[in-house]
Amino acid sequence: MVLSGKPASILITGASSGIGEALACAYAAPDVRLFLSGRDPERLEQVASRCRESGSMVDAAVIDVTDREAMDRWISASDDVRPLDLVIANAGISGGSGSGTETTAIMRRIMDVNVGGVLNTIDLPLRRMAERGQGQIALVASLAGYRGLPSAPAYSASKAAVRALGGGLRPVYATRNVRVNVICPGFVVSRITDSNSFPMPMLMPADKAAKIIRSGLGRNQATIAFPWPMAFSSWLLGALPGWAAAPVLRRMPAKSPDCG
């Protein structure tokens, strides 16, 4: 359980790259047990090895977050090994280029992973943590969730759903001493951003993003949105009426697809 106020048993999805990888390495330490999942077996094992070098005991599993039964089995077994203090629902995929090019199949896949996968990750831990009267759940959304983006309509919709879900769950579970936090990053170096050909303002290294996230979770910050200039701009864009936001949205570059 929690040692000196720090999580000692942590489960992270999407840990084979990007923010998930950086968070796993940031939390890795002696007396910390990590349960990691990802899509890429080779990269996931590399991350697990780095975390073990930092002194952590690591259990790594290649699991599809959209497979509810498999997720329940994995999470239940992990919690049985060492009751989870912190669960980070990080796994997600990006969208296509928008402008009518996202097929229904692509949009459904994005929703299944980014929303369904989050639900499959947090459902069982929320119930168990509520029973124990302690724990923390972090949902990774995005600054893209502040407004529907024509360049990535399904992606922005999925992240808006995650953002709203976390915001709604937070006061409900606060009465049971379970903290719920929402993470809204801007551009963070990852395999997805590596494939983008357009300028990405304030692109941030994953380890720096992990440091910000870890600090925010430690302070139980409701929404951890960064970098702050982009967070403010995203909030403002979301608050604008449609006619005022339209010219800005039309100039936004398309996202590169990542629907594997």
Segments predicted by a language model, with ranges:
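Conserved glycine-rich cofactor-binding loop
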Residues: 14-17
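Conserved glycine-rich Rossmann-like NAD(P)H-binding loop of the short-chain dehydrogenase/reductase
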Residues: 32-47
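Substrate-binding pocket helix/loop in short-chain dehydrogenase/reductase
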Residues: 98-111
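Active-site loop immediately N-terminal to the catalytic Tyr-X3-Lys motif
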Residues: 100, 149-153
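Active-site helix of classical SDR
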Residues: 122, 158
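Residue(s) in the substrate-gating loop at a strand-loop-helix junction
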Residues: 142
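C-terminal helical subdomain
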Residues: 182, 198-234
